[in-house]
Regions:
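Acidic/polar low-complexity surface segments
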Residues: 146, 161-188, 198-200, 205-218, ...
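Disordered, low-complexity segments in secreted/periplasmic proteins that are enriched in proline
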Residues: 30-62, 66, 304-308, 408-428, ...
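Extracellular beta-helix/beta-solenoid repeat scaffolds
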Residues: 108-171, 473-475, 479
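C-terminal motif of bacterial Sec signal peptides marking the signal peptidase cleavage site
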Residues: 19-26
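Bacterial N-terminal signal peptides that target proteins for export
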Residues: 2-13
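N-terminal domain-start segments of secreted/luminal proteins
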Residues: 47-128, 159
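Surface beta-strand/loop "capping" patches
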Residues: 478-486, 490-532, 536-537
């Protein structure tokens, strides 16, 4: 049994972004010339339009109609064309210097053509809105960002329908001002990506797309490869929809504001995501909220630099504040935790398949699950929090240590970087199960609370340890059951039953015969039947119909015993709370069993069936 919760971060509100106005630079070095036609302003779409509908109340707060608008008026737009000989523009609102173009005024700009060393710069008034339409454009810059938003109120980058576009940076970034440009797309202000085409972003030495304000993506298809983070937003990353293939040397999505810790959130309404990263799949400095989408995330350290001292964080979805998930499909293969919050994790829907080297789901404070389907196929500990509350959903988990673990404290390695096995304890910890169907296969404790354990409903099935000093049920405070089905099998050395304050009967029975477990009442009616997948020496059984004053027939494998419930609790186990037992062994064993009780427990531990 081990614990170690990670340092609690501040719970953040979703706030609007600051606008920062600073001057910056470019890539090419030829003499500037200015083109000669009239500039254009953004007008209502006359080509096509598309918007992303959402039933979520947050959607209108996260995105404007303009964020989702992919249409543009080509007849009034400024044309910018790249070629091997340089660039041209159809308006004096664009200055051209070789293969570097600088947009200076509000309007719509359609970019076409290819350059192997060019740049698009937006350097306009800080109240200006600019739409850049990429129409089979390919822009590579050898020493800076291919698209550099130096100043504007907001820039919209739209991929034209059925087009393929590229923005890339190669080589080391050469700084010519104090803005520290370090991405293939670098924006000092708000930037939104949308469209009905494809965009490939490549950064050999830095990030893929960076916004020092809000980064929004509402539609389109994106393939981003970066040495560092693929998507990075200082104040927020907000995604309405779209398809994303992200390959990164650090995080897939990274939102962080070290100047204002109330900012740096991630909000995803929908989308399809394939993330292969050497950092975290999704990393939010404050909150992470996901409404829907498909997420295939693989996060593993760089094998060439992996060591016991490597501080890289390699979690699936991580947040300094709350993680809230209400839907979606998640396939998470992570070297560290699958879901990790320094505050609370709340799951109300979605389908999860998680394979991890540490915790499947971890919260420093509370983990709440009220719906969804969660399959944790591999983990050190399955579900963890100071408080764990399960009221619905279907959960199947496999753990090499504890299945469900409630404890308190902080795991110093949890958010800042690498991971260690959790190792903490707290009497304030609690596990509450009121609904859902839970199946646990644990090599350590099946259900382990350093405080209380309360079961009021649901179905819980535990395949606990087959030997050693762990048990299928382990608690330090009080354990009560008032409803639901709870069956836990495991070794008998540290077996515990529920306590006498329970209102639903619970029995603990020792046995030397593993196999199907059946409980029948005195009329021969089957109250519960269950077949564990592992051998066991002890079983805890509680279900509706088990009451004081009745006699039950319990069969485990080929052994049978008759249990008379003279108390609400039959057999207290090695370290359980007070309880009494009585029964007639119908096999060849003795009445008293062979287990030694711990503090507060019964010395007999329940009858042993042979």
């Amino acid at each position: 049994m081990s614990f170690n919760l990670k340092s609690k971060g501040k719970f953040a509100a979703l706030l609007a972004a600051l606008i920062i106005s600073v001057s910056v630079t470019g890539c090419a070095n030829t003499d500037e010339k200015t083109s000669s036609t009239n500039s254009s302003t953004v007008t209502k779409d006359s080509v096509s339009s598309a918007s992303i509908a959402s039933d979520e109340s947050l959607d209108s707060d996260m995105f404007t109609d303009r964020d989702k608008e992919v249409g543009y008026d080509e007849s009034s737009a400024v044309m910018v064309a790249f070629s091997s000989s340089g660039a041209t523009a159809s308006s004096d609102s664009v200055s051209v210097s070789g293969s570097k173009v600088t947009i200076k005024s509000e309007g719509t700009y359609i970019v076409t053509g290819t350059t192997s060393d060019g740049q698009i710069i937006v350097d306009a008034d800080n109240k200006t809105k600019v739409q850049i339409v990429l129409k089979n454009a390919s822009v590579t810059c050898k020493s800076s960002a291919a698209l550099y938003v130096k100043q504007a109120d907001k820039v919209f980058v739209t991929t034209a329908k059925d087009t393929e576009n590229t923005l890339a940076s190669t080589g080391d970034y050469v700084q010519t001002d104090d803005n520290n440009v370090d991405a293939a797309v670098f924006a000092k202000d708000d930037i939104t990506f949308n469209g009905e085409g494809k965009l490939t972003v490549t950064s050999e030495k830095g990030h893929g797309i960076v916004s020092k304000d809000d980064l929004k993506l509402t539609s389109g298809e994106y393939n981003i490869t970066a040495a560092s983070h693929a998507l990075s937003g200082k104040n927020s990353i907000r995604i309405a929809s779209g398809t994303y293939t992200l390959t990164s040397g650090k995080d897939g999505l990274h939102a962080e504001n070290t100047d204002d810790t109330s900012k740096g959130f991630v909000y995803i309404a929908d989308g399809k995501f394939t993330v292969n990263c050497k950092g975290d799949g999704i990393d939010a400095g404050t909150t992470a909220q996901i409404e829907n989408g498909t997420f295939n995330i693989t996060s593993n350290r760089d094998s060439s630099s992996s060591s016991s001292t490597d501080s890289a964080s390699v979690k699936g979805i991580k947040a300094g504040g709350d993680i809230t998930i209400s839907g979606g499909t998640f396939n998470l293969t992570c070297e560290d935790d699958g879901l990790h919050s320094n505050s609370n994790v709340t799951v109300s829907g979605g389908t999860f398949t998680i394979s991890t080297g540490d915790d499947g789901i971890h919260a420093d404070s509370k983990t709440s699950i009220s719906g969804g389907t969660i399959n944790i196929t591999e983990s050190y500990e399955g579900i963890e929090g100071t408080e764990v509350e399960i009221s619905g959903g279907t959960i199947n988990l496999k753990s090499s240590d504890d299945g469900i673990n409630a404890a308190g404290g902080k795991d110093e390695s949890g958010f800042g970087g690498g991971f260690d096995r959790d190792n903490f304890g707290s009497s304030d910890a609690s596990i509450t199960i009121s609904g859902g169907k839970i199946t646990i296969d644990a090599d350590g404790d099946g259900v382990d609370s350093n405080g209380s354990l309360t079961v009021t409903g649901g179905e819980t099935y535990v395949f606990g340890p087959t030997s050693g000093d762990n048990g299928a049920v382990d608690y330090d405070g009080e354990a009560t059951i008032t409803g639901g089905i709870f069956i836990a099998t495991g070794s008998s050395q540290m077996a515990q039953n529920f306590g006498e304050n329970s209102t639903q009967g619970s029995m603990l029975v020792n046995t030397n015969s593993s196999g199907e477990i059946t409980v029948k009442n005195s009329d021969g009616d089957v109250l519960v039947s269950f077949t564990p997948t592992k051998t066991y020496a002890c079983v805890v059984i509680s279900c509706p119909g088990i009451t004081t004053g009745q006699t039950y027939t319990v069969t485990t494998g080929d052994s049978t015993t008759e249990v008379e419930m003279t108390s609400i609790i039959y057999g207290s186990g090695g370290m359980g709370g007070p309880g009494s037992m009585s029964g007639r062994n119908m096999g060849n064993g003795d009445m008293n069993g062979n287990e030694m009780g711990g503090p507060g427990g019964d010395m007999r531990g329940g009858p042993q069936m042979r």
